[in-house]
Amino acid sequence: MLSNILPLSIGAIFGTTARWLLNLAVPASLSPATGNLFANWTGALLIGIFAETVSHPQWKLLLITGFFGSLTTLSGFSLETVTLLQSNRPASALANIFLHTAGSLLLTWLGLKIGTAVK
């Protein structure tokens, strides 16, 4: 059990830190949602690639479940969308939903294709 928890936890620490750093790197002139969008899109692409190229169970736990699971964030996306709705910005909320959902699905698919090609 500990042999699974350790790689999972290490991946989660670095994934969460990467998401936080991405949010800090977003210029103040852009929407606060931009950092999470970039994290979700990057994570979606890379999770597809690594799902196809990593076979060792411990590395899958560290990278896919730990790192990319904590890099990408449904809770941040949900908060941003609800905040936009509460700010009476329904068009921005719908755009946020579309960009996160469609972009993440497309990039995961692309990542799987890339992973298959390099395998």
UniProtKB/Swiss-Prot annotation:
GO CC list: plasma membrane
Ligand binding (Na(+)): G69, T72
Reactions performed catalytically: fluoride(in) = fluoride(out)
First-listed, main subcellular location of the protein, grouped into a coarse class: membrane
Listed transmembrane segments: 5-25, 30-50, 59-79, 92-112
Topology of the protein relative to the lipid bilayer: Multi-pass membrane protein
Hydrolase as UniProt keyword: no
InterPro entries: FluC
Key words of the record: Cell inner membrane, Cell membrane, Ion channel, Ion transport, Membrane, Metal-binding, Sodium, Transmembrane, Transmembrane helix, Transport
Entry's localization field: Cell inner membrane
GO BP, sorted A to Z: cellular detoxification of fluoride
Single GO MF descriptor: metal ion binding
Domain of life: Bacteria
Regulation: Na(+) is not transported, but it plays an essential structural role and its presence is essential for fluoride channel function.
PANTHER family in UniProt: FLUORIDE EXPORT PROTEIN 1-RELATED
Primary role: Fluoride-specific ion channel. Important for reducing fluoride concentration in the cell, thus reducing its toxicity.
Record protein name field: Fluoride-specific ion channel FluC
Organism name: Neisseria gonorrhoeae (strain ATCC 700825 / FA 1090)
